[in-house]
Amino acid sequence: MTKITNDLFLKAARKEQVDRIPVWYMRQAGRSQPEYRKLKEKYSLFEITHQPEICAYVTKLPVDQYGVDAAILYKDIMTPLPGMGVDVEIKSGIGPVIHNPIRTFQDVEKLTIFKPEIEVPYVLDTIKLLADDMLDVPLIGFAGAPFTLASYMIEGGPSKNYHQTKSFMYREPEVWAILMEKLGRMTANYLIAQINAGASAVQLFDSWVGALSRADYAQYIRPVIEMIVKEVKAVHPTTPIIMQAVGASHLLAEWETMPLDVVGVDWRETITTARQKVPTKAIQGNLDPSTLLAPEKCIAETERILQEGILEPGYIFNLGHGVFPEVPPEMLKKLTKYIHERSEILLKKG
C-alpha cells in the first residue's frame, strides 16, 4: 500500500493540531473537468465506474490538478442499488431514474441481499488500485444514506418535496422500517468493504434528509444511521466516518450523540454555531459552491470561513454541496492554494 505522506485530512478528522487547513471538494472529480467530459463522450457514468483503471484516473485527477488533501472515490450513490435488484438509470440532465419504484411491501420484500465482493467488485478493485499504487493522500469512500436512497427508490427519481417518500413513511411505518433495515445492512456492508479495500475514511451522503423534521428524523431515520455507524466502527474503530447532508442544520444535535467523527455543514450554518451544536465532532464545510462562479465573493467568503475554522482543531475546508459543472478548474486550483497559504499564516499567528 502506498504510504500516505499528506495526512492533514486524517489529523483534522481526529481533531488533532495541523499546520494548515486540509481541503477537498465534494464532486471534485468529474463534471467540471475537461478530461472527464472527454471521457463522458465515450462512456456513461456507470461504464466509467465499472472500469477500475479509468475510474482511478478520474478519482486522482483533482489531487494532481488542484493539490487537494484527500481524494474521494469517483462513483455514484446509486452504484450499489442494482445489486439489490433496483433497475436504475442515470439520465443526462435528470439524474437517477428508477424503473421499478417501491410502492408496496411486496416491492420491499423483493430487494435482495447485497454482497459487495460479488455485486460491486469493480468498486473495490478501484480502491485497491488507488490505495496500493496511486495516492499519497487519504482516499474517502462513500455511500448514500438510507433516507436519500429510499427517496429515489420511492419517488422514482429526483423530487422537490419528497411527498411520496414521506407519505409512505407515515402511512406504512412497519414497511418503512423493513426498507431501512435492508438499506442499512447494505450500506454498512458496503462501507466496511470499502475500508477493507483501502479507503482511509468514509462519508455518508444523506443529501435530502433535511426535508425531515428533527422529530421525524429521530423516529424514522436515526435508528438505521446508528446501526450503520456502530457496525462500521465495530470492524474499523479508528476509521473516520463523515456525515454529510444539505439543509440539515436542525439535525446537528442528533449527530452529536452518535459515534460519528466529522459532520459536514452547508452555508446555511456558520462554523462557529455548528461547533456549538456538535462540540465533540470535527467540522467539514461550508462554502456555498455558487461563489466559485463569483471569484471576489468566493475569496471573501473563504477568508471568513477560515477565520472561524482555525479557532479550534478539527476543521476541514469543503463546500456545502457539490462543484457545479460550470466551475473553471483553474478556480479550484487557485482556491486550494489560497486556503493552504492563508490558513498556514493564520495558524502561525494563533
From Swiss-Prot:
UniProt-recorded Gene Ontology molecular function terms: uroporphyrinogen decarboxylase activity
Pathway it works in: Porphyrin-containing compound metabolism; protoporphyrin-IX biosynthesis; coproporphyrinogen-III from 5-aminolevulinate: step 4/4
Gene Ontology biological process: protoporphyrinogen IX biosynthetic process
PROSITE patterns: UROD_1, UROD_2
InterPro entries: UROD/MetE-like_sf (IPR038071), Uroporphyrinogen_deCO2ase_HemE (IPR006361), Uroporphyrinogen_deCOase (IPR000257)
CDD domains: URO-D (cd00717)
Coiled coil: none
Location(s), subcellular: Cytoplasm
Predominant subcellular localization, coarse grouping: cytoplasm
Residues the UniProt record annotates as site (Transition state stabilizer): D76
Pfam family, one: URO-D
Catalytic activity, EC: 4.1.1.37
Catalytic reactions of this protein: uroporphyrinogen III + 4 H(+) = coproporphyrinogen III + 4 CO2
Keywords: Cytoplasm, Decarboxylase, Lyase, Porphyrin biosynthesis
Residue numbers binding substrate: R27, Q28, A29, G30, R31, F46, D76, Y152, S207, H321
A cellular component term, taken from the record's GO annotations: cytosol
Domain of life: Bacteria
The protein's enzyme class: lyase
Subunit note: Homodimer.
Free-text function comment from the UniProt entry: Catalyzes the decarboxylation of four acetate groups of uroporphyrinogen-III to yield coproporphyrinogen-III.
PANTHER family reported in the protein's UniProt record: METHYLTETRAHYDROFOLATE:HOMOCYSTEINE METHYLTRANSFERASE RELATED, UROPORPHYRINOGEN DECARBOXYLASE
Family classification: Belongs to the uroporphyrinogen decarboxylase family.
Protein name as annotated: Uroporphyrinogen decarboxylase
